[in-house]
């Protein structure tokens, strides 16, 4: 029989996969940097995403919707090499307080603030 702490730890890790799998998923999305110190974990993720995914209907030309263009075309006469679409950086900062397994316990401080206001009668 395993001790209770090891049983809980193995159950906790089996819920969403291993911590290494989570880090691998984050690396697939973008660049992840993680730093851990005593009871604090800082996690920074920078993702390079296409700019048009942030804007609704970015491709809204009549040609895209199936219209046939009429009139003169003022484009380039020679074929040009394709370029990459415009991109934007997306930053995500995560600070976890607790153990090295991430923020297991989340404390909603607004509840305690409202409770303190109700008990003391001050605003």
Curated annotation (Swiss-Prot):
It is a multi-pass membrane protein. Disulfide bonds: none annotated. Its main location: membrane. The chain crosses the membrane at residues 39-59, 101-121. GO terms for cellular component: membrane. It is found in: Membrane. Keywords: Membrane, Signal, Transmembrane, Transmembrane helix. Residues 1-24 form the signal peptide. Partially overlaps SYF1. This is Putative uncharacterized protein YDR417C. It comes from Saccharomyces cerevisiae (strain ATCC 204508 / S288c) (Baker's yeast).
